Amino acid sequence: MSEVNLKGRKVTVHDMCLRDGMHAKREQMSIEQMVTIATALDEAGVPYIQVTHGAGLGGNSLQHGFAPHSNEAYLAAVCGAVKQTKVSVLLLPGLGTMRELQSAYDCGARSVHVATHCTEADTSPQHIAFARKLGMDSTGFLMMAHLNTPEGLAQQGKLMESYGAQTVYITDSAGYMLPGDVKARVSALRDVLKPETEIGFHGHHNMGMGIANSIAAIEAGASRIDASVGGLGAGAGNTPLEAFVAVCERMGIETGCDLFKLMDMAEDIIFPIMDHIVRVDRSSLTLGFAGVYSTFLLHTNRVSQRFGIPARDILVELGRKKMIGGQEDMIIDTAMTMAKERGLLKDATAGVAP
């Protein structure tokens, strides 16, 4: 797979089960499930785990869905249960607030991904600076990275670094990129960032490229990799952590994780709680192929049934329109327009929930 000798390379793994995995669970995860998963990850030697609503701090909303518990309740329970693992949170400026970040810190979170669209790093300076003030491990998280050029992403990453980000992430939110795309973007970042600023990669498995793309990122200089046990996450899931760690062991890349414990955890804990099999299927593959935000999958499946338009057709149109995270309302708008054009919808209000 790799033309570069990566033997001895150290990589910090960040598990996404308890945040990105919330999307696959329609935000319906109990505190008991959270604690069980977090404890197993801790015992397997995973250094970082992310815990919030799928949309991050402030995510409980009509648009993003309501979890049965607050972020604070989840965080307090998980932070109180783990011994070695550090707990992180996701924060999207404009959705999550600095007050909520302070609350997360008070609950025990010590790391944060401050996430923006790949062209909007300039919305993050206050949140990154506040995270640094709290003493948190602070990451700038550039989402939908395929929609910006390597050079453009490098400049966005440089901005985040200037605000205080200690790590900058290339985030393949759509699972669209191929290894060459990842290498080009990570290399461009590495060329402009300070040597001490780390680079991370967050992949989705929509085209089955999560592991290959993560290895490509490491080849180009990334030292932090997001993944999820069992691939539990939006779309076809995140890079499956246990498979990624197995590949790393074969290549001599050091993760510090216990492979067999992760394998057992995927089989015994994660797979049984899945509401549906998180895999590459017709719809999730279309997400990757069309470059659509991975969290749109379940929303689109529901809208497809309501309007009688194949989910694949809706996703392709959303990709053509370059819709991004936060524009979930456009799924309904797009499906309604397509239904009208196909003569499936006479009444402009038909199919709209009261």
Swiss-Prot record:
SUPFAM superfamilies: Aldolase, post-HMGL domain-like. It is an enzyme of class 4 (lyase). Keywords: Aromatic hydrocarbons catabolism, Lyase, Manganese, Metal-binding. Substrate binds at R19, D20, S173, H202, Y293. Residues 11-263 form the Pyruvate carboxyltransferase domain. The record marks R19 as: Transition state stabilizer. Pfam families: DmpG_comm, HMGL-like. GO terms for biological process: catabolic process; L-leucine biosynthetic process. Gene3D superfamilies: 1.10.8.60, Aldolase class I. Mn(2+) binds at D20, H202, H204. It catalyses: (S)-4-hydroxy-2-oxopentanoate = acetaldehyde + pyruvate. Belongs to the 4-hydroxy-2-oxovalerate aldolase family. NCBIfam families: 4OH_2_O_val_ald (TIGR03217), PRK08195.1 (NF006049). This is 4-hydroxy-2-oxovalerate aldolase 5. It comes from Dechloromonas aromatica (strain RCB).
